[in-house]
């Protein structure tokens, strides 16, 4: 339904449970550049089913989990690792190109901007440890899309200048990452 502030959706299901019973409901929500791509991505998830999607996701995560000396250290390391992967990298909807971002939080004043220091000095080491192929893709992005403005304070994800001004740590972060 359309509201004054945009479009909203309500999804409901009615069911009854007897003692000891449980119930699951799965909603598939597709994303795409336009409505056909979004609908067919949801349809593909529906075709494969919840179990397949769950196994694929947990398999991907399990391949990247590191075991540390203690359970607590393992938990902290992997929580931070997956934060680094999921909040500093992503694929664009229009070109499916890998991009890196300093933050995806709407609370951060430069959400979805790119800073070499944040991505390469803070997130990259953990990503390199867990997923060398993704780390290589990040370096291609940095030395490709972001190359023309290395050393500039901050940039948009397409490489253009957001906040001008030279910063040595921004210039050296790609060198250190190599």
Per-region residue spans from a language model:
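Aromatic-rich carbohydrate-recognition surfaces in CAZymes
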Residues: 46, 110-178
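Acidic/polar, glycine-enriched structural segments that form the non-catalytic walls/loops
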Residues: 1-113
